[in-house]
């Protein structure tokens, strides 16, 4: 039993949706121990002594996870160690094992020297002030002490079987699977093959150095190899997973990148066809076309804040059956558990495409599309980013448009929209624009440019 007092941990690692830092600098083995103590204490306070723990394929994983588990055990928690698995497999463990708490040690798509913690306590994904509360527990030494236990649990076969039994493929497909040397490589290619597809694996060996490309399918440059392979192999589809497998990137048979909001169009159509009136949630970065489409299918569109933890909370509150974020997190509550799961989402996509006579390019090109910018980032400071947004919400003049201020400022005009919001994870302002003509796109950009300059004339506006 440890009665030692914790060192002061850097405040910077306690972020909006998770805890994340640079290994050996802001995040050490000792830090992992005390974070384990805080999470264990919080879980026990909520009446949950059982905690599942997993880790991704990062090089720092084994050392950090050992200390994380020790911290949980020293609280008196019963730990189920599920080993090296994708994040959704850890979430799955926290749904189907005895306990409803779980900690995933993962750096997601950050560079190799990062690691972090995604945390579920008693069925709730922690965010914002709940993550700050863990830091306060450590500072106040408000920590449980006890003698817990650790059990190794092989959860992968159970997860594998549940998805395999859930998905019905109408015909086999040829799929290129790029795991970017992330932890999805331990299951995604094998599972997709078990569904009846022929799989061409790309970078599916787990390697925490990420020697081939960064495991972030949200950036087009990381999909170059996948696109080339899909074309060379004449494949039906390309799938790319991020470093911890909770996001998926999609490429059609002709090499077109399908952005997550367009993926959500297909998923919404499918889910609402069986569940008329279902709520479908999407974040403020998604296309305006989703709103009319979801309504047209007979569903109820719900726009919400960006952030996987925040979306999960909103799903619980609304009873939504499906949610998606522009970052690539997709959450199925229909036939699944409601957590973000890149691997399950990929399987659902294959099921839908297998039932369609058209190729994937034609399936997606049938949906309406606008001209859009990629995500534009303006570097500011941690302190100024929220102040700028507050000033824009308070003072800016946007003209004739529908203004949404639930996360930054989004203005929907008759023929397009613009968004400016503060990133919750980095000191940047995030912007995105979309319109049905180039002229309208430029007009909306000009409005936003002028309003930003009015708030702070020194701001760089790279658009």
Curated annotation (Swiss-Prot):
The UniProt annotation places Mg(2+) binding at: 108, 242, 244, 246
Q: What is this protein called?
A: Phosphomannomutase/phosphoglucomutase
Subunit text: Monomer.
Q: How does activity depend on temperature?
A: TM is 66 degrees Celsius for phosphorylated protein and 62 degrees Celsius for unphosphorylated protein.
What is the recorded function of this protein according to its Swiss-Prot or TrEMBL entry?
Highly reversible phosphoryltransferase. The phosphomannomutase activity produces a precursor for alginate polymerization, the alginate layer causes a mucoid phenotype and provides a protective barrier against host immune defenses and antibiotics. Also involved in core lipopolysaccaride (LPS) biosynthesis due to its phosphoglucomutase activity. Essential for rhamnolipid production, an exoproduct correlated with pathogenicity. Required for biofilm production.
Region annotation Topological domain 1: where it falls in the sequence: 13-142
Q: What class of enzyme is it?
A: isomerase
Q: Which reaction does it catalyse?
A: alpha-D-mannose 1-phosphate = D-mannose 6-phosphate; alpha-D-glucose 1-phosphate = alpha-D-glucose 6-phosphate
List every stretch annotated Topological domain 2: 159-255
Q: How is its activity regulated?
A: Requires glucose 1,6-bisphosphate (G1,6P) as an activator. Reaction making glucose 6-phosphate is subject to substrate inhibition, reactions making mannose 1-phosphate or glucose 1-phosphate are not. 1-deoxyglucose 6-phosphate competitively inhibits glucose 1-phosphate. Inhibited by xylose 1-phosphate.
Q: Which residues carry this modification: Phosphoserine?
A: 108
What up-regulates or down-regulates this gene? By D-mannose 6-phosphate.
The outcome of changing residue 262 to A is:
Increases KM 2-fold, decreases kcat 9-fold for G1P. Alters flexibility of the hinge region
- Give the protein's cofactors: Mg(2+)
Q: In which pathway does it act?
A: Nucleotide-sugar biosynthesis; GDP-alpha-D-mannose biosynthesis; alpha-D-mannose 1-phosphate from D-fructose 6-phosphate: step 2/2; Bacterial outer membrane biogenesis; lipopolysaccharide biosynthesis
The GO biological-process annotations, alphabetized, read as: alginic acid biosynthetic process; GDP-mannose biosynthetic process; lipopolysaccharide core region biosynthetic process; O antigen biosynthetic process
Q: Tell me the residue numbers annotated for binding alpha-D-mannose 1-phosphate.
A: 17, 308, 325-329, 421-425
Q: Where is the active site?
A: 20, 108, 329
Family to which this protein belongs: Belongs to the phosphohexose mutase family.
Q: PANTHER family of this UniProt entry?
A: PHOSPHOMANNOMUTASE, PHOSPHOMANNOMUTASE_PHOSPHOGLUCOMUTASE
């Amino acid at each position: 039993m440890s009665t030692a007092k914790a060192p002061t941990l850097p405040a910077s690692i306690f972020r909006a949706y998770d805890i994340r830092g640079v290994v050996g600098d802001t995040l050490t083995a000792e830090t992992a121990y005390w974070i384990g103590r805080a999470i264990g204490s919080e879980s026990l306070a909520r009446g949950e002594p059982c905690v599942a723990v997993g880790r991704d394929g990062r090089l720092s994983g084994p050392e950090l996870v050992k200390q994380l588990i020790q911290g949980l055990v020293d609280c008196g928690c019963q730990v189920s160690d599920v080993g090296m698995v994708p994040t959704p497999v850890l979430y799955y463990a926290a749904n189907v094992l005895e306990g409803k708490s779980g900690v995933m040690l993962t750096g997601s798509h950050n560079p190799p020297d990062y690691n972090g913690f995604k945390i579920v306590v008693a069925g709730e994904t922690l965010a914002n002030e709940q993550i700050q509360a863990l830091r306060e527990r450590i500072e106040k030494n408000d920590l449980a002490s006890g003698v817990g236990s650790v059990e190794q649990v092989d959860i992968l076969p159970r997860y594998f079987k549940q998805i395999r039994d859930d998905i019905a493929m109408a015909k086999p497909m040829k799929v290129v699977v790029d795991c970017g040397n992330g932890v999805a490589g331990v299951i995604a290619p094998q599972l997709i093959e078990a569904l009846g597809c022929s799989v061409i694996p790309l970078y599916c060996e787990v390697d925490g150095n990420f020697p081939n490309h960064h495991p972030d399918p949200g950036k087009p440059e990381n999909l170059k190899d996948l696109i080339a392979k899909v074309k060379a192999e004449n494949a039906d589809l390309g799938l790319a997973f991020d470093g911890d497998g909770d996001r998926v990137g999609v490429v059609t048979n002709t090499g077109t990148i399908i952005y997550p909001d367009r993926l959500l169009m297909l998923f919404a159509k499918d889910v609402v066809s069986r569940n008329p009136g279902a709520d479908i949630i999407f974040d403020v970065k998604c296309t305006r076309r989703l709103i009319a489409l979801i309504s047209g299918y007979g569903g109820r569109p719900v726009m919400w804040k960006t952030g996987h933890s925040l979306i999960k909370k909103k799903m619980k509150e609304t009873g939504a059956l499906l949610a998606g974020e522009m970052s690539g997190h997709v959450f199925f509550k229909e036939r699944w558990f409601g957590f973000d799961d890149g691997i399950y989402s990929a399987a659902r996509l294959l099921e839908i495409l297998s039932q369609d006579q058209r190729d994937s390019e034609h399936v997606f090109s049938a949906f309406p599309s606008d001209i859009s910018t990629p995500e534009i980032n303006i570097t500011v400071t941690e302190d100024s980013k929220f102040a700028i947004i507050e000033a824009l919400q308070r003072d800016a003049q946007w003209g004739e448009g529908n203004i949404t201020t639930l996360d930054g400022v989004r203005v929907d005009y008759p023929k397009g929209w613009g968004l400016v919001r503060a990133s919750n994870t980095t000191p940047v302002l995030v912007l995105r624009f979309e319109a049905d003509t180039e002229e309208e796109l430029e007009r909306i950009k000009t409005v936003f440019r002028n309003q930003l300059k009015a708030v702070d004339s020194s701001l760089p506006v790279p658009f």
